[in-house]
């Protein structure tokens, strides 16, 4: 395994932005695992399938074409909700596990963001961050993002979605979203993007120093 930077956290916490900036800084490939689950969810919806059917969802996950990650539909609000619903199925997570762990084995390193990277996908990652923010802050960020994409959505609905996704992601039996014991907590509630990135960079630099990189 190369030098893995594991970035976990709830929806709209800023982890995706932080992960992307870290990948660019160190020249490492980036895997947004949330897009995998979003792509599975979109594929199920496209086929008029049932997101709550674990067997059907697993079949879709095992047949997933990675080119689906480039579709605009995977970044919509509906895709996010679908991802959270199908991610509760152990079979779906198992189907995507090998792909994620193969990515984590890349040399000289990689950046992977998601909800169970530091606990399940790459538990021995030398650099682990758990990026979070208050639900109201995350809801406002997501609301502004969706409005900017042309979606007509109320802030209150987004906040309700955030609470539901947090409960679902943290309460699932298989690989629940939780901070790894050795992950550094990064609360971005009062931070700008630059401040969050700078804090994350310092966390990673400390880890690199411990590993003499």
Curated annotation (Swiss-Prot):
Gene Ontology cellular component list: cytoplasm
Short name of one Pfam family: Cytidylate_kin
GO molecular function terms noted in the UniProt entry: ATP binding; CMP kinase activity; dCMP kinase activity
Binding residue positions for ATP: 9-17
Record key words, sorted: ATP-binding, Cytoplasm, Kinase, Nucleotide-binding, Transferase
EC numbers: 2.7.4.25
Disulfide pattern: none
Catalytic reaction annotation: CMP + ATP = CDP + ADP; dCMP + ATP = dCDP + ADP
One record GO biological process: pyrimidine nucleotide metabolic process
Protein localization: Cytoplasm
Similarity field: Belongs to the cytidylate kinase family. Type 1 subfamily.
Name this protein carries in UniProt: Cytidylate kinase
The species this protein was found in: Caulobacter vibrioides (strain NA1000 / CB15N) (Caulobacter crescentus)
């Amino acid at each position: 395994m190369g030098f893995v930077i594991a970035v976990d956290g709830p929806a709209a916490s800023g982890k995706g932005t932080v992960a992307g900036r870290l990948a660019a800084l160190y020249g490492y490939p980036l895997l947004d695992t949330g897009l995998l689950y979003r792509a599975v969810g979109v594929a199920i919806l496209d086929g008029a399938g049932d997101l709550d059917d674990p067997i059907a969802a697993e079949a879709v996950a095992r047949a997933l074409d990675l080119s689906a990650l480039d579709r605009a539909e995977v970044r919509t609000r509906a895709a996010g909700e679908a991802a959270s619903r199908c991610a509760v199925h152990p079979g779906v997570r198992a189907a995507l596990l090998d792909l994620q762990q193969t990515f984590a084995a890349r040399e000289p390193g990689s950046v992977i963001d998601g909800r169970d990277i530091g606990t399940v996908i790459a538990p021995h990652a030398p650099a682990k961050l758990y990026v979070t923010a208050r639900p109201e802050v995350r809801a406002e960020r997501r609301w502004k993002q969706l409005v900017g994409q042309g979606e007509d959505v109320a802030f209150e609905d987004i906040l309700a979605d955030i609470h539901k996704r947090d409960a679902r992601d943290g309460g699932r039996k298989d690989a629940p979203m939780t901070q790894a014991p050795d992950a550094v907590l990064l609360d971005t509630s009062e931070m700008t993007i630059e401040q969050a990135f700078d804090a994350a960079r310092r966390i990673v630099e400390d880890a690199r120093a411990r590993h003499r990189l």
